[in-house]
Amino acid sequence: MFLLRGRGHWAAASLGRRLPLRRLRSDSAAPCTPHFDVVVIGGGHAGTEAAAAAARCGSRTLLLTHRVDTIGQMSCNPSFGGIGKGHLMREVDALDGLCSRICDQSGIHYKVLNRRKGPAVWGLRAQIDRKLYKQNMQKEILSTPLLTVQKGAVEDLVLAEPEPGYPGKSRVRGVVLADGSTIYAESVILTTGTFLRGMIIIGLEMHPAGRLGDQPSIGLAQTLEKLGFMVGRLKTGTPPRLGKESINFSILNKHTPDDPSIPFSFLSDSVWIKPEDQLPCYLTHTNPRVDAIVLENLHLNSHVQETTKGPRYCPSIESKVLRFPNRLHQVWLEPEGMDSDLIYPQGLSVTLPAELQEKMITCIRGLEKAKMVHPGYGVQYDYLDPRQISPSLETHLVQRLFFAGQINGTTGYEEAAAQGVIAGINASLRVSRKPPFVVSRTEGYIGVLIDDLTTLGTSEPYRMFTSRVEFRLSLRPDNADTRLTFRAHKEAGCVSSQRFERALWMKSSLEEGISVLKSIKFSSSKWKKLIPQIPISINRSLPVSALDVLKYEEVDMESLVGVLPEPLEKYTACRELARRLKIEASYESVLSYQLQEIKEVQQDEALQLPHELDYLTIRDVSLSQEVREKLHLSRPQTIGAASRIPGVTPAAIINLLRFVRSTRQSRQQ
């Protein structure tokens, strides 16, 4: 017997027996109480990754969603990736996540951003066919072993007494649906997106919705508040959609995809569509007439008047006009699909009344006769302070309850997917009582994302950038598999044999290729004769290796094969291998210094803080009340994480360090 909380009261109940369930269920199809290892609430980008990851780890998983037909829906922009975001996608893929593979099957315009800089900060990006992406994602989800999908709205959580030895006031044991039925679970993951008390806004009109056409989640938001979670409010928005045939593309700047197109997934040798068959994007700009319409009608825009914070790095046109007056702002015209008649004007997120949106659109070059098919709108929603979760994404207050995605204050499909895959892995590991799978700041962009959230929190929608990452040269998009796949295979069991073998082949091929390149040595004068374009000094006395020559911008693997076909030709048979050898050569000299810095940081991260430590009451360590409260809120797991919390002083860190060492010594005795 255990305590449960259902629909606002406490009662006693016993666990229902496990039953095999069909892959897809209706809301009322449960003849008796079902029981799963992991229940995931929400079928967006965090939810799909979480559910699939938990199932890959061997857990019987249920994905609950308001509507099965919206699983994998791209609610805002028709694109994935970008600067920083492309890194996250590569890391999700290295953990055997879904979104990268699905993008390689659904893209209509692939391009690498930031190419003027080094490959460590390149941003893989693609325009995606909305319809195709959703179809491919649903096909993947509905065919995943151990994963069941059910339509249903969750209104409450089933709670029990906490497990001894773990932080938390209670333990989640299941969910209560809107029809009053209960589903029991060992772990629960909330990936509710913008649905917690979601409100859509156009002009002065407001109505409850988590997304256009979908009802918000009210009961669950109230439950979380009653449990003591700190709840905040954020906002976001989306642009109007335009009719393709009504736009004059002939006078606009045309942008074509890359040739060849680089896929997102390490399992993909190429994307599904040839560069010549991909669709172009077009660029236009706002003008002073757009500014005038915005400024003259602020009184008709309640979304702008609200003090709720929106995304800093994806602002509405109203925010841009107010913050940067008298400037022209880019508007990218992006296709929504191969057979779609809609164009997404990226950069034109707006919440003015619909008639003013139409007036504003027709002021823009190329859009003078554009037809608005759907108006833009704003969304306001609840989020939970992410300092209330651990790096495994399990909450401090309720054991075995995990949060992932926009509920943690992030923005973007990629940030949501990254959290989803980590939450899914750890929810499954929690069921089997195994240690959590945590990615540190020194191991990946995912680690930086989660560490920022759990130690610093956020008061505005958080977006990933390369500038947030200390060890960018080591945490590149090209090496995410060698950084994460082997760990995930060993510690979490979430990686398929196909991916593991592919990563193993790539790792051994890189090591072999680098060794061969180092072994080929000639004088600088001979290299100059072989490859005249390299800017090498012929006065160098020491022999120069092929790896050193490959560092020059003018040289790639194909150049070397042209003069040394016998030992090197096999390394260009795989385009990705040849590209990675070039990148490894480019960064070889600086990586040794960064690896030493990483080791120093890892020493701090290795000093674990006891998870049962009560910062508010412990007297064995000297801490101010302010520091105690900050540590109690964030509950850092290591000395390194504690040092990154704003307001935690160096003196407090020293005292914590002494406490940890003395505790460790006493336990050893």
From Swiss-Prot:
GO terms for biological process: mitochondrial tRNA wobble uridine modification; tRNA wobble uridine modification. FAD binds at residues 42-47, 154, 217, 406. It catalyses: 5,10-methylenetetrahydrofolate + uridine(34) in tRNA + taurine + GTP + A + H2O = 5-taurinomethyluridine(34) in tRNA + 7,8-dihydrofolate + GDP + AH2 + phosphate + H(+). It holds the Pfam family GIDA_C_1st. It is found in: Mitochondrion. GO terms for molecular function: flavin adenine dinucleotide binding; tRNA 5-taurinomethyluridine synthase activity. The keyword Transmembrane helix does not apply. Its cofactor is FAD. One of its GO terms (cellular component) is mitochondrion. The keyword Lyase does not apply. Ubiquitously expressed in various tissues, but with markedly elevated expression in tissues of high metabolic rates. Its main location: mitochondrion. Residues 1-25 form a transit peptide. It comes from the Eukaryota. The modification N6-methyllysine is found at residue 507. Keywords: FAD, Flavoprotein, Methylation, Mitochondrion, Transit peptide, tRNA processing. SUPFAM superfamilies: FAD/NAD(P)-binding domain (SSF51905). Homodimer; forms a dimer in the presence of potassium. Interacts with GTPBP3; forms the GTPBP3-MTO1 complex composed of homodimers of GTPBP3 and MTO1. Belongs to the MnmG family. Component of the GTPBP3-MTO1 complex that catalyzes the 5-taurinomethyluridine (taum(5)U) modification at the 34th wobble position (U34) of mitochondrial tRNAs (mt-tRNAs), which plays a role in mt-tRNA decoding and mitochondrial translation. Taum(5)U formation on mammalian mt-tRNA requires the presence of both GTPBP3-mediated GTPase activity and MTO1 catalytic activity. This is 5-taurinomethyluridine-[tRNA] synthase subunit MTO1, mitochondrial. It comes from Mus musculus. The lineage of its organism: Eukaryota, Metazoa, Chordata, Craniata, Vertebrata. The gene is Mto1.
